[in-house]
Amino acid sequence: MSMSFSGGTHNDRWGSDLASAGEFTQSFPSLPATYSPSPSSSSSSGEELLEVTIEFPSGVIINIDSVTGTGTDISGTDLEITSCSDSGSGSRSLSLGWSASSERLTAGTNSKQQIQKISRRGYGYSSRSAPEPVVPHRGEITDSVNLPRALSQRPTRPNRDGSGTERAIHGLKFISSKENGIVDWNDVQNNFAHLSKDGYLFKSDFAHCIGLENENSKEFADELFDALCRRRRIMVDKINLQELYEFWYQITDESFDSRLQIFFNMVKNGDGRITENEVKEIIILSASANNLSRLRERAEEYAALIMEELAPDGLYSQYIELKDLEILLLEKDISHSYSLPFSQTSRALSQNLKDRRWRMSRNLLYSLQDNWKRIWVLTLWFVIMAWLFMWKCYQYKHKDAFHVMGYCLVMAKGAAETLKFNMALILLPVCRNTITYLRSTALSHSVPFDDCINFHKTISVAIISAMLLHATSHLACDFPRILASTDTDYKRYLVKYFGVTRPTYFGLVNTPVGITGIIMVAFMLIAFTLASRRCRRNLTKLPKPFDKLTGYNAFWYSHHLLLTVYVLLVIHGVSLYLEHKWYRKTVWMYLAVPVLLYVGERIFRFFRSRLYTVEICKVVIYPGNVVVLRMSKPTSFDYKSGQYVFVQCPSVSKFEWHPFSITSSPGDDYLSIHIRQRGDWTEGIKKAFSVVCHAPEAGKSGLLRADVPNQRSFPELLIDGPYGAPAQDHWKYDVVLLVGLGIGATPFVSILRDLLNNIIKQQEQAECISGSCSNSNISSDHSFSCLNSEAASRIPQTQRKTLNTKNAYFYWVTREQGSFDWFKEIMNEIADSDRKGVIEMHNYLTSVYEEGDTRSNLLTMIQTLNHAKNGVDIFSGTKVRTHFGRPKWKKVLSKISTKHRNARIGVFYCGVPSLGKELSTLCHEFNQTGITRFDFHKEQF
């Protein structure tokens, strides 16, 4: 069908739902207000006229040649057939007129509804000259009664020219491909110089100029040329160098929204409609641009969802208006943002204007408030080391050997004293059972147990420094001075230490003191180097076969060299040259208690791990190489949410123990852990348990499961723990912010499960107290009679388990869509059971461009439609909405700070160090500028 409008003083653009085929054109020439109607019009003087020509596929033409009224909206007028005329070929054309005073015709009701639809849609198509009326050759309307039938007799599948949209889809694939053959701009410039005539490049040479040589590509290049011209509203067959650069810049723009814009410009040369298969192709391309393999697999389902939404009336379920899709995909969303309240903003601005000295003192004060635990511990440590160093320096400065060896001897002995102290102290932070116990005491309020591993690393730096100073002072200064001393000085000051015969340099080294010292230096340097972050995390890539010298295994086994170091240290300490009295050989005094404590812990852990017998109940291997092990809970195994255990699998390694966060709740009757493959040991775990798993379920690519009963036996598993972690202190805060990156979410899953169990228990107790519970008691640790509300009110308060945490905000940031499967169960449980909104969950998928970016608009639309229809997020497969990109952490903290004024909020983080530093800095800034306080805690492994 084609429609042609002509009239005066009407500048509206109309869109048509009547059009089923052909093209739709409009023309509104600029005419004066005294426009005279055509002779054929039947309107009176002063009326505005509008002529509408509608051509149906059957050949029928309807002329609407009179409109009464000056309003631009025709939807409120009445429809009346004013004339009918036969064409020369025997077909009949109808002339319809709208008149405010005309009599409403029943036969025209359906037509009026369709015309009203045109007015409501209001789409703007490119303005072109109206074609000459086509004389129909078949089909005619004999009277007005047949008009509704004629309007409704449209083909179920329009006779459209599909090549336009299909070529545009092909073009979208083409420019999205990295192997599209488009050359560099310098080559394009050179091609322009050879192909241009008088500074212009003709359309016929455009394909060759941008490097498209074959015939199919040339046809596409011509379509592309026309589309780019239409976008710039120019209709030319040649372009200059500047225009060519603009064309080339858009073609090579890798952003998906730029490619979509080209697609829509190419498709507009067709019929303005797009099919379900074509929508599917766009979804596939959008999913590829955002690295979403699962979305590609369900592209057909989501394409049908879009078709259903954009064509709700069902008239053309296999087509939608292209304009709808274009507006949807290329229109930027207004993203919600959180800003600081005006009072906080004003306060921050005023503070910047104050004296710099005052601000520095204020920052120092806030730093002391945030880090006072660390500060007093480190201060005490430095004071002790300084006192030991000076005490030993003073002691040896009054020895006879000082007259020969001088301050080299003093420096060596001072360093040795701090070395002995630190070799004893470094064992305490790794006595995990002791630290776990101390966390539950009053010491946790003044000692930063969260920083045990960091303190352990800091002490190691002090040990290496003291060791190098001690060894260098002896080997490079003291020994040469002994050899260079005069016979008189030697006999007077040194003979009582080294004997009558002056030793040689080799003789000084080739003694128990020298040999043990050199071996200790070598072993400690090896252990220290392989324990560094770059080696332990395998960030330093070495060529084969030296690649085995880095990684966790190298760190783990090299640390066992330190057992030998402690033995050698005792031998070294009792074989001193300058001390012969046993009570002055103090190395054993420093080491006695810490070594006994550490050895006792190791023995205790060995036997306890054998007593904790666990049976594997369920194994699930998720995409992304994550193994979930659910095992029976030992009877005496008591733990807190947020803690972790060490795991050993003898079939993989009989010596290696690895820490993993517990992901089950203390109230559950089982233990569960999540293990992600990152090294040799975790790879061995995956292989060992993959053997007993079933094949993947339909629709769950890569998912392996194994449940009891199972024909094959599971590999043996040993556990040791539980051990304390920063996350276990969440109960101290009324409001907590939990932030996990990837597998770093595992410490917080146990917390979420624990909170959920408490929420459910609290709801059950509330129902019982209100009289809605019909049971006589609740079978739990906090059971009580529930016969009526009065009886419930008599229950002691100590027997009621209250929920300390009032609000929990969980932010999970992951790169892979399949990661959401790991904790799908708990997320759905929270969404179903948390009626009061205690837990607020936010999932972020970083492989998708952030919200508001046109490259993710299509995905946002599909996500919204599917959630509205099915209540499920298309990315996570849960009821929790997935956000795109990365959270704006400053806005997140600002939102929480505004919502919970004067509160003390615990921020718990597990992930890469870079984000941990950012969150720590933001917490420090908010503590300075706001009235809400954030306490930052980072998981250390």
From Swiss-Prot:
Residues 1-374, 429-514, 579-586, 753-941 are cytoplasmic. The modification Phosphoserine is found at S346, S350. Residues 609-729 form the FAD-binding FR-type domain. It is found in: Membrane. Residues 232-243 are annotated as: EF-hand-like 2. Its EC number is 1.11.1.-, 1.6.3.-. One of its GO terms (biological process) is response to osmotic stress. Residues 254-289 form the EF-hand domain. GO terms for molecular function: metal ion binding; oxidoreductase activity, acting on NAD(P)H, oxygen as acceptor; peroxidase activity. The keyword Protease does not apply. Residues 36-45 have a biased composition (Low complexity). This is Probable respiratory burst oxidase homolog protein I. The gene is RBOHI.
